[in-house]
Amino acid sequence: MKNDVISPEFDENGRPLRRIRSFVRRQGRLTKGQEHALENYWPVMGVEFSEDMLDFPALFGREAPVTLEIGFGMGASLVAMAKDRPEQDFLGIEVHSPGVGACLSSAHEEGLSNLRVMCHDAVEVLHKMIPDNSLRMVQLFFPDPWHKARHNKRRIVQVPFAELVKSKLQLGGIFHMATDWEPYAEHMLEVMSSIDGYKNLSESNDYVPRPASRPVTKFEQRGHRLGHGVWDLMFERMK
């Protein structure tokens, strides 16, 4: 069946023919605290990119459900979730090193042992390092919406990406997205609804209430005060 949702050009393996990145590298200046965290805590919690598949039990030293978060920003929500769910393991990916440093600092302060972080392009990590059928959940919160129509192709949520995520989820695993940009929420819903093997967990077949497991960010709180909406989508891998 032809899928009518617009996507960048991909080959038969789902890899981009020309790499369209969904992010812009804005490295920014590291604070002394972030620099200290990268130097001292990366050796313990950091994961270098490689072309070898990760062994999660070896990485975390135990067998436990694994959640992958893509684009964790400064890491406040990711650290809070890892702290609240010590029985689960978390891998966060972020391309901006100040955010990685901030996350490492917070995770160290909380004494977390169930969190690992990467500083790399998430699509490459998914292709090269995440084993199929290995993740309990994939989280994508507030990705860049690329507001202008001519930039919509840069949005990370496209059919090949959603198919790739599905292949990494276990059966029954969840892909959880959130955005504060309604046109992007509609785009996400269109993309996800077009793919065989996903089930929308919304009772109204569109959006779900924010689950208690997703912390409200400071950015989100400010948006609520200004009357801005937030849309959560949760899709389960069914086959």
Curated annotation (Swiss-Prot):
Keyword Methyltransferase present in the record's keywords: the answer is yes
Extract the Pfam families matched here: Methyltransf_4
Q: What class of enzyme is it?
A: transferase
Which reaction is catalysed here? guanosine(46) in tRNA + S-adenosyl-L-methionine = N(7)-methylguanosine(46) in tRNA + S-adenosyl-L-homocysteine
Enzyme Commission numbers on file: 2.1.1.33
| UniProt-annotated stretches for the region Interaction with RNA | 150-155
User: Which molecular-function annotations from GO does this UniProt entry contain?
Assistant: tRNA (guanine(46)-N7)-methyltransferase activity
Pathway noted in the entry: tRNA modification; N(7)-methylguanine-tRNA biosynthesis
Q: Does the keyword Zinc apply?
A: no
**One GO CC annotation:** tRNA methyltransferase complex
- For the ligand (substrate), the binding residues are 148, 180, 217-220
- Tell me which residues this entry annotates as catalytic: 144
Q: Give the UniProt keywords, A-Z.
A: Methyltransferase, S-adenosyl-L-methionine, Transferase, tRNA processing
Assembly and binders: Monomer.
Q: Which family does it belong to?
A: Belongs to the class I-like SAM-binding methyltransferase superfamily. TrmB family.
Annotated NCBIfam families:
tRNA (guanosine(46)-N7)-methyltransferase TrmB (TIGR00091)
**The protein's name in its UniProt record:** tRNA (guanine-N(7)-)-methyltransferase
Q: Identify the species of origin.
A: Escherichia coli O1:K1 / APEC
